Amino acid sequence: MPTTNTSALTETAYYILLSLQTPLHGYAIMQNIKSITNGRISMGAGTLYGALNALNEKKYIVECECDDPSRREYVITNDGKEVLKKEISRLEEMLQNAQTYFKED
């Protein structure tokens, strides 16, 4: 079980974890996020690598071996999957609340 609080993930962390269901290197993560969000999010390298370091420190992702030693690949851990599942549930609850209580004039 993750040893963190249940605070919301940042949008950056959410999309990185969502992207890392299979091992990917940094540039592929950026491209995947751009694709998932239909171009709405175009993440810069500084943002990506800062977030990767933070997620790695929390043990939500790990660096994995890859064929090309000049590239670092990352993959989500079981703790990362649990955190992602909780975030998806939180977002679903928010959407349900909006659909129930938001009234357009």
Task: Say what each PLM segment does.
Residues 3-47:
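N-terminal helix-turn-helix DNA-binding core of bacterial DNA-binding proteins
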Residues 82-105:
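Amphipathic alpha-helical dimerization/coiled-coil segments
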Residues 1-7, 91-94:
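Intrinsically disordered, low-complexity serine/threonine- and proline-rich regulatory segments
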Residues 68-88:
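Basic, amphipathic "hinge/linker" alpha-helix immediately C-terminal to the N-terminal HTH DNA-binding motif
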Residues 56-69, 75:
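Beta-hairpin "wing" of winged helix-turn-helix
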